[in-house]
């Protein structure tokens, strides 16, 4: 019964112009012909931007490599220059040690003090350094004046106030001391004159008493012998008094 139903469905119907009737199992297809392609051919889709992205990546990598190479070359050149400069400086220093040092070499520096004997109070003298290497000239330039510091002994001046007296010091100590104060000759002139006068008066009194009382010629002779000495002393004392009296 089922097969008969299928056959009835497949029979062409003249009323619809020979078009196939849709069966329950077949899909609906409109305008189907022999030239019409049931399956569409597969079109190859090219990946967009795939080649451009790869080319860009390759270009960027190439530029990075070039930049890295140039930077590496620059670093190598700078390292070579630094090594050459170090080698040259070392060779120059070795040659300077080997050869005797010249006067005009800039490495020579002369440290010479201004004064041959620096003062003890101000420390060392000033140091002149010649940048050109030449020793400083002994004759000072007119702009620079080198002044030696005076010694502290010469700088000490006497006090204006003079010597001060200590406490308890007597004014008589300023006078020169006398070694022999017991004798009458070292006393003051007034005291000496008074002592001379007293001695003369004593001698005169003794001579008069001896001449009046004693009758011995020896006593008279001694009195007469002593009298001119006493007179001479008295005369000298009188002369001194006359000289000292105001005129």
Curated annotation (Swiss-Prot):
Secretion signal, residue range per the UniProt entry: none
Keyword Phosphoprotein part of the UniProt annotation: yes
Domain of life, per lineage: Eukaryota
Modified sites of kind Omega-N-methylarginine: 122
Regions of compositional bias (Low complexity) in chain numbering: 83-94, 202-216
MF-aspect GO terms: protein serine/threonine phosphatase inhibitor activity
Residues modified to N-acetylalanine: 2
UniProt protein name: PABIR family member 2
Biological source species: Homo sapiens (Human)
Lineage: Eukaryota, Metazoa, Chordata, Craniata, Vertebrata
């Amino acid at each position: 019964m089922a097969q008969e139903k299928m056959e009835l469905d497949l029979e062409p119907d003249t009323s619809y112009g020979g078009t196939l009737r849709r069966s329950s199992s077949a899909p609906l297809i409109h305008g189907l012909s022999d030239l019409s392609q049931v399956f569409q051919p597969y079109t190859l889709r090219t990946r967009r931007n795939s080649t451009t992205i790869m080319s860009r990546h390759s270009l960027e990598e190439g530029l990075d490599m070039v930049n890295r190479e140039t930077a590496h070359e620059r670093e190598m050149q700078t390292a070579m220059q630094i090594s050459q400069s170090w080698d040259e400086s070392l060779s120059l220093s070795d040659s300077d040690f080997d050869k005797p040092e010249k006067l005009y070499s800039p490495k020579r520096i002369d440290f010479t003090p201004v004064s041959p004997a620096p003062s003890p109070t101000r420390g060392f003298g000033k140091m002149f350094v010649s940048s050109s290497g030449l020793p400083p000239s002994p004759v000072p330039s007119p702009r620079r004046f080198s002044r030696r510091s005076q010694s502290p002994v010469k700088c000490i001046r006497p006090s204006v106030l003079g010597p001060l007296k200590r406490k308890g010091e007597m004014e008589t100590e300023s006078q020169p001391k006398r070694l022999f104060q017991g004798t009458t000759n070292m006393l003051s002139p007034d005291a000496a004159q008074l002592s001379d006068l007293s001695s003369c008066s004593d001698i005169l009194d003794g001579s008069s008493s001896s001449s009046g009382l004693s009758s011995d010629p020896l006593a008279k002779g001694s009195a007469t012998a002593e009298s001119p000495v006493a007179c001479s002393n008295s005369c000298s004392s009188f002369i001194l008094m006359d000289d000292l009296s105001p005129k």
